[in-house]
UniProtKB/Swiss-Prot annotation:
Organism lineage string: Eukaryota, Fungi, Dikarya, Ascomycota, Saccharomycotina
Gene this protein is translated from: CTM1
Domain SET, chain residue ranges per copy: 46-273
Gene3D superfamilies, sorted: set domain protein methyltransferase, domain 1 (3.90.1410.10)
Ranges where the record places region SET-like: 184-288
Coiled coil: none
Full protein name: Cytochrome c lysine N-methyltransferase 1
Length: 551
């Protein structure tokens, strides 16, 4: 294929890129017989080279390729190299906080637009953009972000994605030499194609000690980026780096497959990670593989609807949304698919125990219960905490502080940049009659860890609250009609996945089955959490000010 020639890729006989079952493309073994006997004893005899790629695109080598134009195209090359340096150099400050993958998207956009404006750009990069990044339709979250924010407004991940897209677009418009209003749809296309294809490639820092000195770099690897992801039971290949040449190589793994027994058109599949994150898959690729049982781990995370948490108070008194804000508790649940193909709540996470804290209220109301107070008691505690009891105008200092924390309470931000002085607890666990702040949370957490009776009572109260939430959320999801998001696959896939998981959890509750993983396997305590939402800026910060401190 033309792209292989342009990008210096070598493809083994019997291998081809073809349409896959999800509407995209994959790499297939169309003629297994062509691979029989191709294993090289010098490589250990347990693998066959299917693909070798010399041209890899990442931030570093895109910069190098554009700088190299100075010596390749005389004046045109110098002009293009200077323009690229100018655009990127002036963009660094605006893009200092974005990920390296976002920078890769930005570099690709700049190179593409420079080519459109008549600047000399490297042919292989230009062809890759035209053929792959612009020629691949990926119905992932970035291509339907408006609909995703309508249906999942409460999920911080999609606000973060939207903010990244807006930041890249705004920077692009302001830095390109032609002040055209470049379409954000073009950016979304390149963004969606890039994030769905990017691979984490290890890069050597010091040749003499490679294993201890390398970084993982988000990279686009032509042809290899057509290879799809499989679980541990279907994976039959893996990629590696040729340390001597720097090439990326795709190997057929002969420890798991025998090419002589493969059927024609067997798909080549690699495993990216041991953790299969349904939400991440839908966000990046626009689809979620079916349930399966593997030696890996499949998870699904969802964020509570914060309006529900605020309007449906626990015990008719505790505003769960407000409580989670003040204690900076991530308002998300993580579900794990166990070996019996059942979705269960991951209660091994430290953050899950923090979710339980507001529910650690005795039903008898005589042992311990939470109290919210933003009046004189809160004022006293704030003044003591900030040591501002000797200011000239204490009333004015308190008024300013109260205005600020009230603004945060009503904002969409999940984290509060103040100590939780408005929340106190009356408890027989404490020597004092009343305590407050993060120390208070630690006391309750310690009691939860060391009192099985209290833990059971707390989880029961949490489950009762969750059961009502499930009824509410399932009703919302079941009102969804696919026509609402026609051709926006990521939205419909995410709704279907969340609905499926929540229905299974509710069924377990109705059948008096445990909904908790209750595993002693330490790997479950380290699974990744969803990000928290912190996108609104306080009105007392001007546009040029640094973001407020959330620590």
């Amino acid at each position: 294929m033309e792209l292989a020639n342009i990008c210096n890729a070598t493809i083994a006989k019997g291998i081809a890129v073809q349409k896959d079952s999800y509407g995209g493309y994959g790499v297939y073994i169309v003629d297994p017989g062509a691979l029989v006997g191709c294993n090289d004893p010098k490589l250990g005899g347990d693998k066959i080279e299917l693909l070798r790629v010399s041209s890899v695109f990442n931030v570093k080598n895109l910069m190098e390729a554009m700088n190299a134009l100075e010596g390749e195209y005389a004046e045109d090359g110098q002009r293009a190299a200077d323009m690229f340096k100018s655009i990127i150099g002036s963009s660094i400050e605006e893009l200092s906080a974005v990920s390296e993958t976002c920078l890769l998207v930005y570099f690709m956009m700049v190179i593409y637009l420079m080519g459109e404006q008549g600047y000399a750009v490297p042919m292989k990069i230009s062809r890759y953009i035209d053929t792959v990044l612009l020629g691949t339709t990926v119905n992932n979250a970035s291509n339907c972000i408006e609909s995703m924010l309508i249906h999942y407004e409460h999920v911080a991940l999609f606000h973060e994605l939207d903010n990244n897209l807006q930041k890249l677009h705004k920077t692009l418009i302001s830095k390109m030499p032609s002040k055209k209003n470049y379409s954000i749809e073009l950016l979304r296309q390149i963004y969606s194609a890039t994030v769905s294809r990017v691979l984490e490639i290890p890069q050597e820092l010091h040749e003499e000690n490679y294993m201890d000195n390398y970084v993982v770099t988000p990279s686009l690897v032509p042809i290899l980026d057509y290879v799809n992801h499989g679980d541990k039971t279907s994976r039959n290949a893996y990629y590696d780096v040729d340390r001597r040449k720097g090439d990326i190589i795709l190997y057929l793994d002969l420890t798991v497959v025998n090419p002589g027994k493969l059927k024609p058109n067997t798909e080549v599949l690699i495993t990216y990670k041991d953790i299969e994150d349904s939400l991440a898959m839908i966000t990046k690729y626009g689809f979620d593989p079916a349930n399966y049982t593997t030696t890996g781990t499949k998870i699904f995370s969802c964020t509570f609807d914060k309006m529900y948490l605020s309007t449906n108070k626990f015990d008719n008194e505790i505003d769960i949304r407000n409580f989670y804000q003040w204690f900076s508790i991530n308002p998300s649940l993580q579900f794990v698919l166990n070996s019996e193909n059942e979705w269960l709540i991951n209660d091994s996470l430290a953050e899950f125990e923090r979710l339980l804290v507001p529910f650690a209220t005795s039903s008898q109301r005589n042992e311990h219960y939470w109290i919210y107070s933003d009046g004189d008691d809160a004022r006293k505690r704030f003044m003591e905490y900030f040591d501002i009891d000797e200011v000239e105008d204490e009333d004015e200092a308190w008024a300013q502080l109260e205005t600020q924390f009230k603004w945060f309470e009503s904002s969409e931000n999940d984290l509060m940049p103040f100590p939780p002085c408005v929340w106190t607890v009356k408890s027989k666990f404490l020597k004092e009659k009343e305590a407050t702040g993060y120390e208070l949370e630690k006391v309750i957490q310690n009691k939860l860890e060391n009192s099985r009776a209290l833990y059971n009572e707390t989880t029961n109260q949490f489950q009762a609250y969750l059961e009502n939430y499930l009824d509410y959320r399932i009703d919302v999801l079941q009102e969804y009609s696919p026509e609402d998001t026609e051709n926006e696959n990521a939205v419909s896939q995410l709704i279907a996945r969340e609905l499926s998981v929540l229905l299974k959890i509710r069924d377990r509750i109705n059948n008096n089955k445990s909904i908790f993983l209750n595993s002693e396997d330490k790997k479950y305590a380290k699974l990744p959490l969803l990000p928290t939402k912190n996108v609104e800026r306080p009105p007392w910060l001007s546009e040029g000010d640094d973001d407020f401190d959330q620590d």
